[in-house]
Structures are given as structure tokens and as C-alpha cells.
A protein has these predicted regions:
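Alpha-helix C-terminal capping segments
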Residues: 119-129, 143-155, 176-177, 275-285, ...
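Active-site-proximal loop->helix
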Residues: 141-204, 301-311, 422-430
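Claisen-condensing/thiolase-fold acyl-transfer catalytic domains that form or cleave C-C bonds
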Residues: 265-269, 273, 365-431
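Active-site nucleophile and cofactor-binding loops and adjacent substrate-binding regions
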Residues: 103-114, 132-141, 233, 262-267, ...
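Active-site/ligand-binding loops adjacent to catalytic centers
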Residues: 64-66, 190, 196-235, 243, ...
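A short, small-residue-rich loop immediately preceding and capping a beta-strand
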Residues: 116, 124-163, 257-271, 291, ...
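Positively charged, low-complexity intrinsically disordered leader regions
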Residues: 3-129
Length: 454
């Protein structure tokens, strides 16, 4: 009998609410602190940076938050996204495991990022904001918020981490096509950028530094400009839960329940998007689903960092955030998974990790790109370098099931496609790709610098 390959929902089955996991967490995340007073930040203090309704969502403890119809209308351009059985990959591995993936690469920008870009642009538009600033690593977020900002007639300035700016010129052109201005970070447009270039004229940049530049620029024009962020914060991961909510329904359609749910990890948005609705099943129904975050060995905040208060950016413009961190001055190696080159984890994910409710693994770069090639050859989609981390972890788990002779059901999130990341694949296929892993001394040096913050 022919097995179903794709499990698709109708637009009427699309989620109409976002799921806020804070309502179900046994231990709530610690509050962000004002770096001067060391007291919890207030809505008023955050309002110079973020739109007011986004701040309300950031601080909310309500389990569900309605998705505005205007946002749902744009979501329907690409949502619901397919759930796919990776039968080709299963056959290639010779595994008894059943492998499913949620295909977020079908969005206009090619990744999961528009799930939060659209509501962020919408709430800023509602508030009368005319200009937005943001950072981007690999460019998936920058392209997504450019798409969303153009839809609502908002100007956008993007600071793109220099190593990715150089590696991925076509994603920069996507931003330009949607009307955004994009510059390499560090830049000469801000004090933060100029200071970084003075310290190191050849600085390849980091997400933390790009955030500093974007926040600094937003603070110059509080009357009509705000900052928006593509990961880490509570309201961002909230918006991404449309992924997992759809996947819960689709797995039921497939008459399957995952033993484990896997997502790559940079700041937490796609991991939370796929994982949090399944954690809800653990909390509410007593399930034992493993939820696994997979980060690069070159930027291992969950597996080798420490849980501390730290800045979300290099210059210290953000509140102090409770997070697993490598230290905001940590300079990641120039891995191709630019979207995962962030020093810290969001406060919700960090608290879940601290409480042992999720797991974390780190993956070497060469293994992840090898997994990406195998996936492309067996399932047809060239995955983004970020997504290959989830694929590599899935392959490890599937081969482990084969060795043990047990049937496991694995779900991972394909967070984006890699058709504009082909330089990474060129390097891999040429045998020129290298693994990077910071030394204990490097990590200890930047973590020790946090002692004075609290």
C-alpha cells in the first residue's frame, strides 16, 4: 500500500492563536534587569526600543494570544506548511526509525523567520512607526523582515554580520529587492561599529555586535523608529509556535507521535517554534517527548556556556537577560551557519534547559554539511546550513535506533532552504570546510568578564 508522503492542512486549520509556554513552565523565567538599577525592566523602559504590543507579549503569562486577522491573512501566503515523511532519507540510512520534517523553507523568504517578521511589522505599523532597524546573521531574518516591512510600508535598515554579508550576497539582494537598506556590521554608521573596527579593522562581526548597531540607530529617533529582533526574546519565540501547533495536528494525521523533536539552535526561535507545542503535551498530558536543541560546536552556549545574566548585545544597549551564555564579547568562529553565531540563549529556553526539560547537543560543521548533502540527495531540498544541524542530529538518532534495533519516530524542523548558501556546499564538496571549536580558555575569558554585571 502506498504510504502518504506529505501531510497538509487547509487554511481553515491554521492556528488562530500563538502558544505562550510561560503559562505552563514549572519555573518561570527570571526577569530581564535594567543594567543601571539591576531591577526588572519596565514597559516604559522598553518602549523606546520595541512596539508597545510586542512588549505586552514579551511580559505576558497568558497561555494563548490571538493572532490578528491582518497577520493571518499574510500567513496564508505560505501557511500552513507541509509535514513531510523523509522516506528517502530513511531508506538511505537503512533505519527502522520514522523520520518526519516540518518544511518551513516554503515561505517567501525561504525560512521560518516570516512567522515573527509579519506580526512585528504589523504591530509597529499599528503604532505609527515609520522606520525599523534590525540585525541579521545569515540574512534569513533580514530578508524576512524586509518582506514584512515592505508589506506595511515601513522603511528598514539592516545590519548584516560581515562574514555573512561577504559569504551570502544574494540574500542581501533579496533585502534590497524588498526595499531594505543593508550594510555590513561592523559599520561606520554607529559608534558601536566604529569602536569594533578600531579594535580590529578586520573584524568579521557577530550577531551581538549587529544588535548593538541596530539598537543604537533606533534610539537616535525615538519619535518614529523602533528596533526588531529575529530570535531570543519571548515575543519572537511566541510567534514561531504556529510551526509546532500545525505539526501536532499533522502528526496526528500521520497517526504518529514523535519520540523526539529536534531543532537547530542559535537564539531559540525555530527550536521553540517546533518544540514548545510538544513540550505542552509533556506538561499537560504527561508525555515523555524528548525536545532537543542542536547548536554548532563553534558557538556552544547551551552545551559549554553558563547560566548568568548577560547583555544581549556587545555594546550593552539591551537589558541584562538571564541566559546560557558564552559572554557577550565572545567572537564566534566564521562558520557558515551564520544564523547560529549568537553568544546566548533566550531566557525561556535557558530556564527550560536549567530545569532539565529540554536537551542540547553540539555538532561539528563538516558533519552538518555532510548531512545536508545527504538530505538534498534523498529528499530533494538543499537545506540551509543552520537546518543541517537538526538533520545531522536526526541522522545520529536514526542510526542509533538502527544499532539498537528499535523503531523511533523523529520529527525535526527544516527551518530554511540553502539555495542562497551554496558557497558553504561548494567549500564542503571541495574538501575545504573545517571544524571550529573554541578552547575552554577562550570561553572562560569572556564568561569571566560578566562577574561585574550583577
Amino acid at each position: 500500500m502506498m504510504e502518504t508522503k506529505k501531510f497538509c492542512l487547509t487554511e481553515k486549520q491554521m492556528p488562530t492563536q500563538w502558544y505562550n509556554i510561560v503559562a505552563d513552565m514549572p519555573n518561570k523565567p527570571l526577569p530581564p534587569l535594567h543594567p543601571g538599577t539591576k531591577k526588572p525592566v519596565t514597559k516604559e523602559q522598553m518602549s523606546a526600543i520595541f512596539a508597545e504590543e510586542l512588549i505586552d507579549q514579551e511580559m505576558s503569562t497568558e497561555r494563548y494570544i490571538d493572532i490578528p486577522e491582518e497577520v493571518q491573512e499574510i500567513y496564508r501566503i505560505w501557511r500552513p506548511t507541509p509535514l513531510v515523511r523523509a522516506t528517502g532519507l530513511e531508506k538511505a540510512l537503512g533505519t527502522p526509525a520514522k523520520i518526519f520534517f516540518k518544511n518551513e523553507s516554503v515561505s517567501p523568504a525561504g525560512s521560518h523567520k516570516p512567522n515573527t517578521a509579519v506580526p512585528q511589522a504589523y504591530y509597529n505599523y499599528k503604532q505609527g512607526i515609520k522606520h525599523l532597524t534590525t540585525e541579521t546573521g545569515a540574512g534569513q531574518w533580514g530578508a524576512s523582515i524586509a518582506f514584512a516591512a515592505k508589506h506595511f510600508g515601513i522603511d528598514l535598515q539592516v545590519f548584516m554580520v560581515k562574514v555573512s554579508y561577504d559569504q551570502k550576497p544574494y540574500r542581501r539582494l533579496m533585502m534590497n529587492t524588498w526595499g531594505a537598506e543593508c550594510v555590513a556590521s561592523p559599520s561606520t554608521l554607529t559608534e558601536s561599529g566604529r569602536a569594533a573596527l578600531e579594535r580590529d579593522p578586520h573584524c568579521s562581526g557577530s550577531l551581538g555586535l549587529a544588535i548593538s548597531e541596530a539598537v543604537e540607530m533606533a534610539l537616535r529617533r525615538p519619535e518614529d523608529t523602533r528596533y526588531c529582533l529575529g530570535s531570543v526574546l519571548n515575543h519572537v519565540v511566541l510567534h514561531q509556535t504556529v510551526i509546532g501547533q500545525e505539526a501536532v495536528t499533522q502528526m496526528e494525521m500521520a497517526d504518529a507521535e514523535p519520540d523526539m523533536v529536534i531543532g537547530c539552535f542559535g537564539g531559540g526561535s525555530n527550536f521553540a517554534g517546533i518544540g514548545f507545542p510538544f513540550l505542552r503535551k509533556n506538561f499537560a498530558e504527561g508525555k515523555k517527548i524528548r525536545v532537543i536543541a542542536v547548536e554548532p560546536e563553534g558557538c556552544p552556549k547551551l552545551t559549554r556556556g553558563e547560566f548568568q545574566y548577560d547583555f544581549g548585545d556587545v555594546a550593552g544597549f539591551t537589558p541584562l537577560i538571564p541566559m546560557y551564555t558564552l559572554g557577550h564579547d565572545f567572537q564566534p568562529s566564521d562558520i557558515h551557519a551564520g544564523g547560529l553565531r549568537y553568544h546566548g540563549a533566550g531566557s525561556i529556553v535557558s530556564q527550560l534547559m536549567k530545569d532539565g526539560l529540554i536537551e542540547a547537543q553540539s555538532m561539528p560543521q563538516v558533519e552538518t554539511l555532510a548531512a545536508g548533502v545527504l538530505f538534498a540527495q534523498t529528499e530533494g531540498i538543499i537545506p540551509a546550513p543552520e537546518s543541517t544541524h537538526a538533520i545531522a542530529a536526526t541522522i545520529r538518532e536514526a542510526l542509533k535506533a538502527k544499532e539498537e534495533g528499535v523503531s523511533k519516530t523523529i520529527l525535526f524542523n527544516l527551518s530554511g532552504n540553502g539555495v542562497i548558501d551554496l558557497y558553504a556546499y561548494e567549500q564542503y564538496l571541495a574538501g575545504a570546510l573545517k571544524d571550529f571549536s573554541p578552547s575552554d580558555e577562550e570561553i572562560r575569558k569572556t564568561i569571566n568578564q560578566l562577574e561585574h554585571l550583577i
